[in-house]
Each structure stands twice: as C-alpha cells, then as structure tokens.
C-alpha cells in the first residue's frame, strides 16, 4: 500500500498529512505559517523539511517510502515568475519524490468538491471565493 503526502502551507499554519491509497490517515502534524510572500522562501522550505520529517516519523516510514506528494502553497501561481524557483527548491529538498505544487485554493477545492462543480469559500487568514463549472473550468 502506497503512502501519500499532502501539505497545506498557509498564512497561519502549515498542515502535513500522510495517508494510504484508500485515504486512511497515517499521520498528521501542524507547524507554523509558510506563506512565501510573507515569511520568505527559505522559511517555507525549512518548514517543509521539518514537517515532512515529523509526519513521516509519526507514520513510521522513511521519506523515501512516499509515492508522491501535493504541496499547496498560499499565493502559488499569483506571481508566475516565482513558480519555477519554488518548484526547483521543493524538488531539490525532496529528491526522487514525485511532487506537484499548487495554490492552496486548488487543495481546498479538491477536498471540498471532490473535483466536481460547486463553489468553495475560504475565510481564513486570507479570504477568497472560487467556483468550478460542469466543464471543470475554475
């Protein structure tokens, strides 16, 4: 059974989850804020490294036992020129781990709407409303 990593980097906290293919939670931990535009890229990478080590330790696995990971970063994609650097640094931090980076809104919509049509409103440290139509367009 494969182990999968999900990370939600936000303005108030960063949540780490390891689950198995069926979605069963193996481990979960929360660390401090990781918004690269506020806290800086180095802070985000430090929190990612620490959090992944912690959540894998709680799950009783080595980082190399993760099959893939999704890292949701607040503000990711808002400044397109920042994306390649963030992707490169995350890939260097976790060599060999297939990673996808995305905006925290993508993470939220996937979780709440299960990739189906609907509206999702986030009212956290920052606020935003999003929608996804029948055609899958956001």
Regions found by a protein language model. Name each.
Residues 115-138:
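Glycine-rich phosphate-binding loop of actin/hexokinase-like ATP-binding domains
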Residues 17, 70-72, 100, 120-122:
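Short, conserved beta-strand segments within well-ordered enzyme catalytic domains
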Residues 78-79, 107-109, 128-129:
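Short, active-site-adjacent cap segments at secondary-structure transitions
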Residues 1, 96-121:
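Conserved phosphate-binding catalytic cores of ATP/NTP-utilizing and phosphoryl-transfer enzymes
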Residues 55-93, 112-113:
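Short beta-strand-loop/turn "lid" adjacent to the catalytic site in phosphate-handling enzymes
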Residues 19-21, 111-115, 135:
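Alpha-helix C-terminal capping segments
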Residues 3-50, 138:
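Short glycine-rich, Thr/Ser-proximal phosphate-binding strand/loop in the N-terminal lobe
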Residues 12, 75-76, 125-128:
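Short glycine-rich anion-binding loops that position phosphate/pyrophosphate groups of nucleotides
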């Amino acid at each position: 059974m494969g182990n999968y990593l999900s990370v939600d980097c936000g303005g108030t906290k960063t949540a780490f989850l390891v689950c198995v293919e069926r979605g069963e939670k193996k481990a979960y931990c929360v660390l401090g804020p990781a918004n690269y535009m506020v806290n800086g890229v180095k802070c985000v990478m430090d929190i990612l490294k620490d959090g992944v080590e912690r959540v894998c330790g709680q799950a009783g696995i080595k980082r190399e036992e993760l099959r893939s990971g999704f890292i949701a970063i607040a503000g990711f994609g808002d400044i397109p020129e920042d994306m390649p650097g963030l992707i490169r640094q995350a890939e260097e931090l976790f060599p060999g781990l297939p990673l996808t980076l995305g905006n925290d809104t993508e993470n939220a919509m996937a979780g709440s709407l299960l990739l189906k049509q609907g509206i999702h409103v986030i009212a956290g440290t920052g606020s935003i409303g999003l929608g996804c139509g029948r055609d899958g367009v956001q």
